[in-house]
Amino acid sequence: MQNYDIVSADSHINEPPDLFMNVPQALKELAPKVVSYEKGDAWIMAPGAEPRFVSTSAVAGRKKEEYLKEPVTYANMCKGSFDPEARLKDMDIDNLDADVMYPGIMRYLERCANDDIRLACAHAYNEWMADFCKFNPSRLQGIGVVPMLDDNGGKNAVEAIKFAAKKGIRSVFLSQRDGGLPLNHPSAEPFWAAAEELNMPVSIHIHTTPFLRGLKPEQLALMGTKEMGITTVTLCMSEHVGLMMFGGVFMRHPKLKIVFAEGGIGWVPAFLERADHVFRVHKPYLGSTITELPSETWRKQCYATFQEDVAGIRLRDMMGVETLMWASDYPHTDTTWPDSKKIIDKTFAGVPANEKHKMISENAARLYGFKS
């Protein structure tokens, strides 16, 4: 019998360079490709697009001060980011019993050329991820991807989540873009309904901040700009929660589960307190028709993942221990690998054992269907 003591609810993979070689022939010229540069390997998401280097997507095993010093390629990156056997070995080193894996470059699916190639890439990725997890399904679960809600009036997202479910994927990541349809848009309703019917949690993962994406290269190079972006990127999560709560998405789909991934948890209590205030004081004249306090909805339908978040853990009662899931973020720059056990013990110092177990194992194991 499998015993789950530590489960990472948010780690990552790096998609293999040949992942999209079998997309329909008519779309092959539009498919993402890996190109090797002097600075390392990079994905080109669409013809003429700027390269997205894999440099910070596979740093596990390197010293922090060396992250950007040497080119990172598929030949020298940690193999656990794309090979299941190597993955399990790295999990053993880190004392992880199970791992929930998010996409790498496919987090940027919205940057592909058009609706058709985005759907084809989603299908290719979801099939590959399902096969990856078959290597050891008692320890590996993969998060699928679905295209933007904008694509084909939302129909592509519905098709992708149904395809992923048929392949055995148990949860999906929703692709988004600046200026795209908001999560409370009527066109999103068929997708939320499909996720609810399929009993598949939907993940909203942190992205780069809108502020950074609007900067010119010379502005981005100014000292402190990148550090600011990494510091504040978690705060964007509150916008997604607010839209879904006050937009009535949770009310219309009471069995829908949403995971807010890698955004930490320290912001959640302050957001919920403010949202409850808005519910009582401002909602009556602003027009939202929701009937339940946002803090109550959160406890029923929302989850959040975090790595090291002592402030959030201290305020855990304000959001519900059952909604919180620890993560290692392997093999990215925020990763706790290979010292997760040591970091967990420090981060959770003074937390009752039963509550700690829920946050570092039980909640994720239950949500993603790991079987003991």
Name each model-derived stretch.
Residues 12, 104, 177, 208, ...:
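Flexible loop residues that form catalytic
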Residues 120, 133, 137-141, 146, ...:
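Catalytic pocket-lining loop regions of alpha/beta-barrel enzymes
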Residues 2-7, 16-70, 74-78, 82-98, ...:
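Mid-to-C-terminal alpha-helical segments outside catalytic/metal-binding sites
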Residues 14-17, 99-101, 107-112, 150-153, ...:
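Short catalytic/ligand-binding loop motif for oxyanion handling, primarily in non-cytosolic enzymes
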Residues 116-132:
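Active-site-proximal gating segment of KS-fold condensing enzymes and close homologs
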Residues 110-114, 230, 341:
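Short acidic, glycine/proline-rich loop/turn micro-motifs
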Residues 6, 71-79, 89-113, 139-146, ...:
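Divalent metal-dependent hydrolysis catalytic cores, especially in the metallo-beta-lactamase
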Residues 7-14, 202-207:
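Histidine-centered catalytic micro-motifs
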